[in-house]
Amino acid sequence: MVMEALREEGVDTVFGYPGGAALNIYDETYKQSYFRHVLTRHEQAAVHAADGYARASGKVGVAFVTSGPGFTNAVTGLATAYSDSIPLVLISGQVATSLIGTDAFQEIDAVGISRPCVKHNYLVRSIEELPRILKEAFYIARSGRPGPVHVDIPKDITAAVGDFDYPTEIKMPTYKPTYKGNAKQIKKALEVIAEAKRPLLYLGGGVVAANASELVRKFSAKTGIPAVETLMGLGVLAHEDKNLLSMVGMHGSYAANMAMSETDLIIALGVRFDDRVTGKLSEFAKHAKIIHVDIDPSSISKIVNAHFPIVGDLNFVLEEMLEKVAINEQNLTSWREILARYDALNPLDYKDSDEIIKPQWVVRETAKILKESGKDAVIATDVGQHQMWVAQFYPFDRPRQLITSGGLGTMGYGLPAAVGAKNAMPESTVVNFTGDGSILMNIQELMTATEIGKPVINIILNNNFLGMVRQWQTFFYGERYSSTDLSLQPDFAKIAEGFGGAGFVCRTKDEFRSALKEAMACGKTAVLDVRVDRFEDVLPMVPAGAAIYNMILKSKE
């Protein structure tokens, strides 16, 4: 029945790792031919790969794991997807119904554990309810505010035989997302937009999740309102869009953060006012009225009070707003001049060097070489300084181009997510930017990438540190580098070769250029160990608890 449900849902790829309680599912997987099963080397990686597949494709990602430690290994993947509203369905095996509650071998209360980090979960209690549950799981995962759904199936139920009657419609009276925005609220929002002197578009991952980027681009082009993007919203507007200031937040640009501080109207689309964006709440956008459009009513006024809340799907709401939106062009001209001065005062840049490789240079040079290749590129990251440098310096030009863990900040996410993205976008060049700390957390997935013949390029910005933690220690902990020095390291290039891939060590700019071009041409999963400046900082930086306009702009001497 699981196989038939996946066929009905159009699933073409599943990521997973087998075990005793999931053997019936895997036996049926062996017999079918309509989806590909990708055997990862760890259950956490299976869920991250399903997550990366979902982000890159816009489809629901699917993963299989077994009970007990198989499931607990998957929890970080669920929490990562939940934090970023990523649609996926995790199907876990469970001990037989008669053994539940007996502390049986590899028994764990999976639904109890998953409850805080999924949109919904199920413990299947009979074969008769399995088709309905699977239908609901996919519907819940992709509808409204997307998210992961967990389905736990005892082994006796996967062994049972029954009639497969897949529902043609969903009957969930207590779950009915609101898609069409309130007309009166939309009218009020349009009125305040017309009156605004310093309006600002605040764009987040919800725009990507709703596949509403084209409408946002039309809205931006029609109004000319300056815009900022969150980490999860990068690519909603193209990098070169004249209205886009850049990323906002803890490591956002000076101009973007000052715009958020001085705006008199925030038009918030698909965002949740995360602490990394707001900074000190009492100082956040003190002069601004807020229009907040989101399909999830629980996100509105949760952190920052919305003066004009609109619950609805961005596609429906923006279609209505586009017809009637008007702005005061004279006000906008003055506002743009103010923002241009901020950008000129502290542009997002870095001091390059001919003596040592700067990590920002690596990001920009990678973008340049990828563009010259003429192929589409998908960029994955792990979590740390490299993630922020990619966000700051990679010129994203479309949604779903950046695959990164935003809300949970999961180290070890990048490589398996890149494997998932490559399965979703096999014709695209997939590059994973990682650090010498993050890469070791799921490095076994080099084997997965090699086995399935879908190469991923991994660029390690190697500074012999847990770089972001080291940066905090530099600024806020008296330069006491407790447990962040990673000077003792493995040979990453040889590890890559041991997994059947290609390995490169890059100590100069020329070596990096040559290695990246060779990696793109060799047809193997590759690792580029790029030795970068050890003490380079990600700047600007808003200290924890500080106002968003209170930025550190220079490294400590």
Question: Residues of each region from the PLM?
Answer:
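Active-site diphosphate/adenylate-binding microenvironment
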Residues: V2-M3, R7-D12, Y17, I25-T29, ...
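Active-site nucleophile and cofactor-binding loops and adjacent substrate-binding regions
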Residues: Y17-G19, V38-H48, A63-G70, R125-S126, ...
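Generic enzyme active-site microenvironment
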Residues: H150, H292, A380, F433-T434
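A general structural motif
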Residues: E43, T102-D103, K176-K188, V248-G252, ...
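N-terminal alpha/beta PP-like core and its mobile active-site loop of ThDP/TPP-dependent enzymes
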Residues: M1-I327, I369, P455-N458, F476-G478, ...
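Thiamine diphosphate
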Residues: I91, L99-I100, F105-Q106, I300-I303, ...
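Phosphate/pyrophosphate-binding active-site segments
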Residues: E128, F164, E191, H287-V383, ...
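A glycine-rich phosphate-binding loop feature that marks nucleotide/adenosyl-phosphate handling sites
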Residues: D152-I157, D382-Q385, D533
